[in-house]
Curated annotation (Swiss-Prot):
Listed pathway(s): Nitrogen metabolism; urea degradation; CO(2) and NH(3) from urea (urease route): step 1/1
Location of the protein in the cell: Cytoplasm
Organism superkingdom: Bacteria
Gene Ontology CC entries for this record: urease complex
Gene Ontology BP term (one): urea catabolic process
Gene (name only): ureB
Protein name: Urease subunit beta
A Pfam family this chain is assigned to: Urease_beta
GO terms of molecular function: urease activity
Length: 113
């Protein structure tokens, strides 16, 4: 073995196997492309993305880590979301939650509802 060498096992790796998912249709109503990364709290994405937000609370895109989905102006596409894991606390992004997802995090406000 060479230091740093990877010896992958045979077969495929299924991402997020057995996890609950939500599928939403999302439209970019803005005049610029919007890109959303794999671990961004989807509930808090750019307000120009039009979709039913409440089912996206506590969810992220079901795509490989480090990748993103790009929404061109006027585009509409279907995305699959999976729940954020770990401590399920959200801070930053667009400051719509700022705390635990499964408890007392503040509710959404403003245009991003």
């Amino acid at each position: 073995m060479i230091p740093g060498e990877l010896l992958p096992l045979e077969g495929e790796i299924e991402l997020n196997a057995g996890r609950e998912t939500v599928t939403l249709t999302v439209a970019n109503t803005g005049d610029r492309p919007i890109q959303v990364g794999s671990h961004f709290h989807f509930y808090e994405v750019n307000a120009a993305l039009n979709f039913e937000r409440e089912p996206a609370r506590g969810m992220r895109l079901d795509i490989p880590a480090g990748t993103a989905v790009r929404f061109e102006p006027g585009d509409e596409r279907t995305v699959t979301l999976v729940p954020l894991a770990g401590s399920r606390e959200v801070y930053g992004f667009n400051a719509r939650i700022e705390g635990p997802l499964d408890g007392k995090g503040k509710k959404a406000k403003g245009k991003n509802k």
